[in-house]
């Protein structure tokens, strides 16, 4: 809120990192209202890893220059069955985070469980459920693609303060498995 008592809009860039495709989604928040700005994908070509990471870094910087976000929300890495895939995903995350940090933007990180809980209300929701809820929450005419939807969901999670659709647990309580427990 500004000093004049007005609510100030905040622009959030959500990123869903991947070495082949990194989804991005930009939303504006004004109080509890969410407004879609843009979404898309940064794609890398097959080739040497350093070149692909540079493509991601440059792509994130270009998105930031175009849409001028105030904050960035990035999905955290999950541990895959294949350790090599996990390492590559971690490097892609590093490139997109460096892109944001090099533009002097604050970066928040959320697990997939937190993002799904925030957007769908269920931490183990299917990708299609996330796409559907992103479409509804942002009043989109069509469902965004899976990578863009995940990025928009990450931005929505950040707009919700990392909390689920039900909001934060009250003072003196904590949220666990969808319910508030007394301390």
From Swiss-Prot:
Cofactor(s) the protein requires to work: Mg(2+)
UniProt cross-references to NCBIfam families, sorted A to Z: ruvC
EC identifiers of the protein: 3.1.21.10
Catalytic activity: Endonucleolytic cleavage at a junction such as a reciprocal single-stranded crossover between two homologous DNA duplexes (Holliday junction)
Keywords, in A-Z order: Cytoplasm, DNA damage, DNA recombination, DNA repair, DNA-binding, Endonuclease, Hydrolase, Magnesium, Metal-binding, Nuclease
Main location per the UniProt record: cytoplasm
Subunit: Homodimer which binds Holliday junction (HJ) DNA. The HJ becomes 2-fold symmetrical on binding to RuvC with unstacked arms; it has a different conformation from HJ DNA in complex with RuvA. In the full resolvosome a probable DNA-RuvA(4)-RuvB(12)-RuvC(2) complex forms which resolves the HJ.
Manner of cofactor binding, per the entry note: Binds 2 Mg(2+) ion per subunit.
Catalytic residues as annotated in Swiss-Prot or TrEMBL: 16, 75, 147
GO CC, any one term: cytoplasm
Residues engaged in binding Mg(2+) 1: 16, 147
Protein family per UniProt: Belongs to the RuvC family.
Binding site for Mg(2+) 2: 75
Location within or outside the cell: Cytoplasm
Phylogenetic lineage: Bacteria, Pseudomonadati, Pseudomonadota, Betaproteobacteria, Rhodocyclales
Keyword set includes Secreted: no
Function of the molecule: The RuvA-RuvB-RuvC complex processes Holliday junction (HJ) DNA during genetic recombination and DNA repair. Endonuclease that resolves HJ intermediates. Cleaves cruciform DNA by making single-stranded nicks across the HJ at symmetrical positions within the homologous arms, yielding a 5'-phosphate and a 3'-hydroxyl group; requires a central core of homology in the junction. The consensus cleavage sequence is 5'-(A/T)TT(C/G)-3'. Cleavage occurs on the 3'-side of the TT dinucleotide at the point of strand exchange.
Identification of the protein by name: Crossover junction endodeoxyribonuclease RuvC
A GO term for molecular function: magnesium ion binding
GO biological process: DNA recombination; DNA repair
């Amino acid at each position: 809120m500004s000093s004049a008592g007005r609510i100030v809009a905040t622009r959030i860039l959500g990123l869903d990192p991947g070495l082949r495709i990194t989804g991005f989604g930009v939303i504006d928040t004004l109080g509890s209202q969410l407004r879609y700005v843009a979404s898309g994908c940064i794609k890398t070509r097959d080739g040497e890893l350093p070149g692909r990471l540079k493509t991601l870094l440059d792509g994130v910087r270009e998105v930031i220059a175009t849409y001028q976000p105030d904050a960035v929300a990035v999905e955290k890495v999950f541990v895959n069955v294949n350790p090599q895939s996990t390492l590559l995903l971690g490097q892609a995350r590093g490139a997109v985070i460096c892109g944001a940090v090099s533009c002097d933007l604050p970066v928040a990180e959320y697990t997939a469980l937190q993002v799904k809980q925030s957007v769908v209300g269920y931490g183990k929701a299917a990708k299609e459920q996330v796409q559907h809820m992103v479409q509804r929450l942002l009043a989109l005419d069509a469902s965004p693609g899976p990578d863009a939807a995940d990025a928009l969901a990450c931005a929505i999670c950040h707009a919700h303060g990392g909390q689920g659709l039900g909001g934060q647990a009250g003072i003196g309580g904590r949220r666990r498995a969808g319910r508030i427990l007394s301390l």
